[in-house]
Amino acid sequence: MSMSSYPRQRPRRLRSTVAMRRLVAQTSLEPRHLVLPMFVADGIDEPRPITSMPGVVQHTRDSLRRAAAAAVAAGVGGLMLFGVPRDQDKDGVGSAGIDPDGILNVALRDLAKDLGEATVLMADTCLDEFTDHGHCGVLDDRGRVDNDATVARYVELAVAQAESGAHVVGPSGMMDGQVAAIRDGLDAAGYIDVVILAYAAKFASAFYGPFREAVSSSLSGDRRTYQQEPGNAAEALREIELDLDEGADIVMVKPAMGYLDVVAAAADVSPVPVAAYQVSGEYAMIRAAAANNWIDERAAVLESLTGIRRAGADIVLTYWAVDAAGWLT
């Protein structure tokens, strides 16, 4: 019997039908993998659209409660809350973030009351939204971010957020020693079960641009003395390993799409879950292309999220969390 000249190995066999492709899929994307970032602003009477992020708003307390309930009903895995205070409440040390009556802590209590343990309630643990200079920390007399003074404020922020009902605190300022200090502070205050999601590898990225509008940032200058250089993968792994040593329960890479190599490397070394943040600029980029009918928004979003999961992210923060949950179910 003569051998066929055609290939015996035909990978297309495993792509022949929808059912076959589903059976052999190597990467899953489910609503539970997704976390919805949400913004809540003080002093507004109705949701305020964020022009650079079409479809995303700064919520009032009431609209936040409705949107959060809808996200939970859609099956989204968690909610990450950012507070936007009034300009007159900002100061040099971010006091509004620690104030129990500050917008973020009040909103956390609202959602903790409404949702209980039906979702994972996360809080951004940083000062940039609350400072009049827009930096992620306390400035010294030369105008530089004072690492240790900032970490002390982060501990106060984290404890205030835990007291308000956060299940997860997310230190995002990239200060040295922040995870260990926050862990010690939470434990001393009795919040031993509150999870720390460490922004372990946060790069100084151009893709944060729309976020500055989202939180009404007062920043002038840049954050390159504490956020990482985009080309430094080995440094990112060092930061991840330091945060793991300090007790991080989850480590995150931010942004996501331009840093999938770092996500993959983090997944290789991390014994705890790895998260990745599909940031505002990534969202705006796809939305703009879709608005011009240059790409199919749904297909592009699901492909991008699948790529982040394929790289090794267990959790993906995305402004499409609710939309994607609907598309996936």
Swiss-Prot record:
The record ties this protein, via InterPro entries, to: ALAD (IPR001731), ALAD_AS (IPR030656), Aldolase_TIM (IPR013785)
Q: Which reaction does it catalyse?
A: 2 5-aminolevulinate = porphobilinogen + 2 H2O + H(+)
Sorted alphabetically, which PANTHER family does this protein's record hold?
Answer: DELTA-AMINOLEVULINIC ACID DEHYDRATASE
Q: Which residues are catalytic?
A: 202, 254
Give the disulfide map: none
Task: Specify the protein name.
Answer: Delta-aminolevulinic acid dehydratase
**Keyword field contains Glycoprotein:** no
Query: Which pathway?
Result: Porphyrin-containing compound metabolism; protoporphyrin-IX biosynthesis; coproporphyrinogen-III from 5-aminolevulinate: step 1/4
Q: Which residues bind Mg(2+)?
A: 239
User: What gene name does this entry carry?
Assistant: hemB
Positions contributing to 5-aminolevulinate 1 binding = 212, 223
